Amino acid sequence: MHDQLTIIVPRRGINDEGKGKKHALYCLISAAKTEYVWMQDDDIILQSLEVKGESLEVKGTDLLILPLRMQSENEKPSLLELLQIAEYAAIQQLTIETAKRGHAVMCSGANLIARRDRWLESYPDLHPEIPSGDDMFLLESFKRRGLKIDVCESEQLTAVVRPHTSWRAFWQQRMRWAGKAPKYTDKDILLCGAIVLLANVLQLLCPLVLLVKFPLEYTLIKKRDASVSLSSALLLGLIYPIYMLIALVGGLFRRQW
């Protein structure tokens, strides 16, 4: 498979010509000679450096969503790290489940494979004027064009990402994510976002809603990351409505993403 893939790792300030990550991706992918490109963030940790061909079957797929897991570098993660790990597990499992059913609502450019020509055709849809969000806008573009999107659950291809260690960095990232929401047009993404927003507003109005929400959330979390404790997941469930609304309002009113 390696002769069909080019690994693309954009680095800020190195190959972006001062124009941001999306321009760096465009330059690197344009220069690639293979049918597929494997996009990776420069700070991910791959489980294995040797990928067997049978573990990575991409033929016939235009976009392959690869798995991610969040792990702390610390033996005893901080409260902030524990909450991020629980949230990330839920997000990743939701990504997998919706993609398997043909209604993908999320993907991450930290670990993603795309057909080179399809990516280049979709570049104008990535909103180059917005510094981030290349992965989600790419997903929307591929879905709109009716291209084939698949998901891989192989442990061998799972990449590890690190949680933020400061509250400032955490909030900045969440507000960037929320700030892109008005640009989304895909009906699956909008429906999923509306359901999540409604459920959390209802929980704020009536805390007993957590009794209905939490079993589903905890199932998603444990299915993706069995190491997440009940206490971490429950704390996340309790504070999530407030946290989500702060991030959403803050993101929508930020002048810069």
Regions found by a protein language model. Name each.
Residues D42-L56:
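Acidic donor-binding/catalytic loop of UDP-sugar-dependent glycosyltransferases
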Residues C192-Q256:
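Membrane-embedded multi-pass helical conduit in multi-pass membrane proteins
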Residues L63-A90, L120, D125-D188:
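Catalytic donor/gating beta->alpha subdomain of glycosyltransferases that bind UDP-sugars
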Residues T95-I113, Q156-A159, P182-I189:
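A recurrent flexible, glycine/aromatic-enriched loop bordering the glycosyltransferase active site
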Residues N15-A32:
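Glycine-rich, basic loop-to-helix element that forms the pyrophosphate-binding segment
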Residues K33-T34, M106-S122:
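Conserved nucleotide-sugar donor-binding
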Residues M1-R11:
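Hydrophobic targeting segments
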